Amino acid sequence: MKKYKFFAALAAAAITFSSCSMDTEPYDQTTTPYTNLKGVETGLNGAYQILAYYPFLGNYAQTMGDFISGVSTGSSSSGHFYSYSSFTFSDTEQEIEDMWNYGYKAISQSTEAINSANSLIASGAISEEEKPTAYLYEGQLYTMKALANWYLVNYFALPYSAANASTPGIIV
């Protein structure tokens, strides 16, 4: 019996001391600029993924208006969006912060890919037959960037009027 306890303690110690390292690089960050059209396509796919992620257009940004207006109601048992349905939310709610962060992540990713596509086209790194595809990707990226800005303005900026014309809307 002592043998089993010894091996169990040894196995537990081995598992404990062989845990994963916290010194990892973020997997969604690029350290080098895009060097070809495939890189721009990868940036485009990344922008789509960020835009459709649940804290932004995958859930929160699309449903927030429904909950705040009373079209939908949050469940008190799950707590999901309940504070918005009952008008007891604050400006520090996690959903609001996530919408802000992922909106700007989508804008940043789109801008990075647009700038890379433009520099590749200007430098001649993209061939003439690839240019229509590059322009197609660029158009999609501009659309995603505009959509993300539109949602951020709708949720976080003041309504435009002559009285607040000098007040900034969102950070551009």
Task: Give names to the regions the model predicted.
Residues Y4, C20-D66:
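Membrane-proximal, proline-rich intrinsically disordered regions
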Residues S161-V172:
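Short, flexible helix-coil linker/hinge segments at the edges of structured domains or between repeats
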Residues H80-F156:
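Conserved, well-structured interaction surfaces
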Residues K38, A61-D91:
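A structural signal for short, hydrophobic/glycine-enriched beta-strand patches
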Residues A52-L57, T73, A148-P159:
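Secretory-pathway/luminal and periplasmic proteins that interact with or process carbohydrate-rich
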Residues M1-S19:
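Sec-dependent bacterial lipoprotein signal peptides
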